[in-house]
Amino acid sequence: MHNMSDIIEQYIKRLFEESNEDVVEIQRANIAQRFDCVPSQLNYVIKTRFTNEHGYEIESKRGGGGYIRITKIENKDATGYINHLLQLIGPSISQQQAYYIIDGLLDKMLINEREAKMIQAVIDRETLSMDMVSRDIIRANILKRLLPVINYY
């Protein structure tokens, strides 16, 4: 059985498929009511599964008529998406942000499950056992070297 976050994620992705558009607008209260969950559950899904690293932009308006507008970033080809990711990676990157990038690569079928697990193992904090600042810098450098390889092979 999937957890509530998985169910909400699949629902939002289905909205994209059904609309044939690159933009979906949802209302927090409606989604929370539909899935009998608190609005913060929806916020969690948006913040972790529809990130820039996954290829989405989020616009949010709070209040009575508030909405969340989720836009697919228009990168129809692998090169455009890889270049987008390379621009997102600064001089350092946290393990969580790096995992979001790996999830995005998996979602776009640029890597398979096995490759994703190998990349995660290489950039994991246990593998890079050093101070956090150095670890995040090395993780960013690894990803910056790895992404072009994924693009060309």
UniProtKB/Swiss-Prot annotation:
Organism domain of life = Bacteria
GO biological process terms, semicolon-separated: regulation of DNA-templated transcription; stress response to cadmium ion; stress response to copper ion
The answer, when asked if Transcription regulation is one of the entry's keywords, is yes
Q: Does the keyword Protein biosynthesis apply?
A: no
Upregulation details from the record are: Up-regulated by heavy metals such as Cu(2+) and Cd(2+), but Zn(2+) and Co(2+) have no effect. Forms part of an operon with mcsA, mcsB and clpC.
Per UniProt, which keywords does this protein have?
DNA-binding, Repressor, Stress response, Transcription, Transcription regulation
Signal peptide region = none
Q: Which InterPro entries match?
A: CtsR, CtsR_C, CtsR_C_sf, CtsR_N, CtsR_N_sf
GO molecular function terms here? DNA binding
Listed under subunit, the entry gives:
Interacts with McsA and McsB.
Query: Which purpose does this protein serve, as stated in its record?
Result: Negative regulator of clpC, clpB and clpP transcription by binding directly and specifically to their promoter region.
The entry's family comment says: Belongs to the CtsR family.
Protein known as: Transcriptional regulator CtsR
Q: Which organism is it from?
A: Staphylococcus aureus (strain NCTC 8325 / PS 47)
| Gene this protein is translated from | ctsR
